[in-house]
Amino acid sequence: MGQEQDTPWILSTGHISTQKREDGQQTPKLEHRNSTRLMGHFQKTMNQVVMPKQIVYWRRWLSLRNPILVFLKTRVLKRWRLFSKHE
């Protein structure tokens, strides 16, 4: 933990960030504007990168032939042909 210019000491206790005031009391700290802006930028960038990859993976997955479905389809078609021949 370091002290930056214009930024009070910041202590991280578990998931709650607190800042130490001049009188020694700790108060809950709101996230610094720059870190909030940076996180928003990071999330936006990750969404732009991750979403197209997810779409590509889904398209690949959907384009793959599912062996079980192919097996069932051929089995049903064979039975249908046999059944229709007997009638």
Swiss-Prot record:
Protein name, as recorded: Protein PB1-F2
Ranges of Basic and acidic residues composition bias in the record: 19-34
InterPro entries hit by this protein: Flu_proapoptotic_PB1-F2
UniProt record similarity statement: Belongs to the influenza viruses PB1-F2 family.
Subcellular location, principal: host cell
Keyword Amino-acid biosynthesis: no
Function: Plays an important role in promoting lung pathology in both primary viral infection and secondary bacterial infection. Promotes alteration of mitochondrial morphology, dissipation of mitochondrial membrane potential, and cell death. Alternatively, inhibits the production of interferon in the infected cell at the level of host mitochondrial antiviral signaling MAVS. Its level of expression differs greatly depending on which cell type is infected, in a manner that is independent of the levels of expression of other viral proteins. Monocytic cells are more affected than epithelial cells.
GO cellular component: a single term: host cell nucleus
